[in-house]
């Protein structure tokens, strides 16, 4: 059994307190993606952060203890990064040399290009976000977005509506690795879907000019049902994928947002599996806490980063929920603050 021990909790300031958008609404940070590049945490909010000098993607240093230092906050403002909307996950390529970022791909306007910003897979060299490129772009000049990739996702998922919330690159049998997309929702429409924990993917290679190309067909690879596990109390959807190169395994993060007798419940669970078990379509193991019970996050766990062979960083996207619970002695967070947890993993 894999056990998680909580090392620390905290919050990160992701923009100035009291920041408002063009409609004079208070901006709320909703961190949905995080990756550790070996030097810094790279994070993203799935809602825009206004200001020409800002974007929804930003980075900050962490201490040797794994604590983020929000005084080192730096926004990534290169054109494609600033334009893409509703980021859901980050990953490093299997060789650790490039950063990948995906949006949710949960909406498109077939009559116009108005919603193309929600359909992006981006890649840039480690530490060089200004060299960002769009993966699988539309071949028409001036049309933004990974629209060729969207067509491949349509075929692999096989549903009119879906939402991508996971991204990971693992070693593969072809090319430079196997790129995995985690599906959280699928169905007929945004108001007619089921929560799922499903993975589709394809092998890829990195081109000479630093872009990513798929070398085989995007296809369904894996699926499991958290509800079949004892101790899982809520219906979950996949919220993040993370490859652990130190232990050659895959983490799967799931989260829930349900209403029971008029009371809203949010939270999440963490799962782990060896890569050979993933390839064999075996069930993942539910991570337990120090008491041996299933680890259940009290916040909506959406972002996951491997820091080293033993430590994980979990970021929460609580939407408009402002309560901090065990994260802090304060009752509520500021809208500019994102809560997080640092875990130590043992087997």
Model-predicted segments: where are they?
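Sequence/structural signature of beta-propeller domains
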Residues: 1-347
């Amino acid at each position: 059994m894999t056990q998680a021990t909580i090392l620390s909790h905290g919050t990160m300031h992701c923009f100035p307190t009291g920041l408002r958008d063009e409609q004079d609404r208070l901006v709320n940070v909703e961190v949905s993606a995080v990756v550790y590049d070996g030097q810094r945490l790279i994070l993203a909010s799935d809602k825009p952060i206004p200001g020409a000098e800002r974007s929804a993607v930003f980075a900050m240093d962490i201490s040797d203890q794994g604590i983020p230092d929000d005084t080192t906050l730096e926004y990534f403002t290169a054109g494609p990064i600033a334009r893409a909307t509703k980021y859901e996950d980050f990953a490093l390529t299997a060789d650790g040399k490039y950063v990948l970022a995906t949006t949710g791909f949960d909406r498109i306007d077939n009559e116009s290009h108005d919603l193309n910003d929600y359909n992006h897979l981006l890649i840039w060299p480690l530490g060089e976000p200004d060299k960002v490129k769009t993966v699988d772009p539309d071949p028409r000049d001036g049309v933004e977005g990974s629209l060729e990739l969207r067509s491949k996702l349509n075929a692999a998922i096989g549903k009119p509506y879906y939402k991508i919330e996971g991204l990971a690159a693992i070693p593969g049998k072809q090319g430079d690795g196997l790129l995995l997309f985690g599906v959280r929702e699928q169905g007929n429409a945004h108001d007619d879907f089921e929560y799922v924990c499903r993975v589709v993917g394809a092998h890829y290679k990195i081109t000479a000019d630093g872009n990513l190309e798929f070398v085989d067909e995007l296809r369904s690879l894996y699926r499991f049902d958290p509800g079949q596990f004892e101790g899982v109390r809520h219906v979950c959807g996949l919220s993040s994928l993370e490859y652990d190169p130190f232990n050659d395994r895959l983490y799967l993060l799931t989260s829930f947002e349900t209403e029971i007798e008029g009371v809203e419940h949010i939270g999440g669970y963490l799962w782990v599996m060896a890569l050979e078990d993933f390839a064999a379509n075996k069930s993942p193991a539910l991570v337990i806490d120090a008491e041996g019970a299933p680890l259940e996050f009290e916040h909506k766990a959406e972002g996951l980063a491997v820091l080293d062979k033993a430590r994980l960083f979990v970021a929460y996207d609580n939407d408009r929920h402002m309560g901090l619970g065990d994260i802090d002695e304060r009752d509520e967070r500021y809208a500019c603050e994102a809560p997080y947890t640092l875990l130590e993993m043992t087997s």
